[in-house]
Amino acid sequence: MVREFCSCRSVALLFVATLFCGQAMGQLVEKRTFVSQKKINAFDNTTFCTAYLSDGTMYTMRDIAISDLRNIDHIVFNPTGSSLAVLRQKKPVAIFSFRDRNKKLFELKEKRKGLKEKPLVLAMCYGSDARNFIVSNSLGEIVVYDTREYLPQAYIQGDAPATSLALSSNNYFIASAVGKEVVIWNFQTREKRKSIPMPAVVKEVAFSPDASLLAVTTDDKRLTIIDTKNWDKVDIFDKLGGMLTSPSFHPEGKYVSVVRDNKDIIIVNLKNSVVEQELPEAQIGVMGTRFFKNNQNSEVFLLSNRPYQIVFWDANGLNPFYGKIMGKEVDAKMNEWVKMMQGESMEDYAIRVNDESRLKQQQLFAQEVATELAGDRISID
């Protein structure tokens, strides 16, 4: 039954694609730039809340110093937008307010006694729901903190230090970059789930918003996409023409952006495994890309930088993931259709809802949704 339904949906999707045939492919368009008087070495954001580093000091997009701290190596935004985690060499991670200048909220000091050496933090990240904050250190540990008091909740001992971390949106998995391996940990049980060998040293890891995929960049100029259901490598992009960094998933999961050689932005279409768009820059100095959705109106943007600019790209022109949209719409309609109607007897229900009628109704809904999607797209164009 499932296979038949999937094929029916594919037919309907083909119908949509036919209607769109001949229309121009969607593209990112530069929307707005914020010029800085200072050179941008790194940045982070949560939606439109953006901070950047310049010569070890953190600033807002308006070149306003967030604190007087110097020698900052790395910053990570709390998804709430209210604070940032700040990493300095040989210093405890500190949490600073984004709203109040120089306001330190927490400091994650090591309080354990009897350690042979003081652990140094190497990587850090927040969970997408802002409830958890994790760091990796030089002892090979991954430390889990709550975000109310920033107290350690668990110490996960690995075989070697992790240099990049990602926490899945469903709080099921931690992905860590450990040499030539991606090590997956079960976030709930704190147990190792899987070690995935890679052909070269792993640079960065990033989960898709729905946690179904994991993007991995390695220092052999590859972008690898991994399915989190079975941890199989489902796509490898090894001909993008340079060293790849800063992978970021589009909110719908259909596209991934990467930076090539700290200069050009590449948008990869995961649906058909091709480059959707290249955004060449005039000079080296692009430090990252980050897709995000404006939660107020569901518009999608890509954030990047130039040496002296923060750049917002309008990503709403990218073609939607019609298969995923159709699946959700058809499933929602079917969930309503299979409900017993008011006054309907069990006998009547059994006649109305059976294997044959269910499949037929799925086909009708798939065609209906495909027609609606095609109509919406044509009206937009």
Enumerate the language-model features and the residues they cover.
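Short coil/turn segments within WD40 beta-propeller repeats
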Residues: 56, 91, 139-140, 180-182, ...
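WD40/WD-repeat beta-propeller blade N-cap
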Residues: 34-39, 66-71, 109-121, 156-162, ...
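Residue-level detector of Asp-centered blade-edge/turn motifs that repeat once per structural unit
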Residues: 45, 79-80, 128-129, 169-170, ...
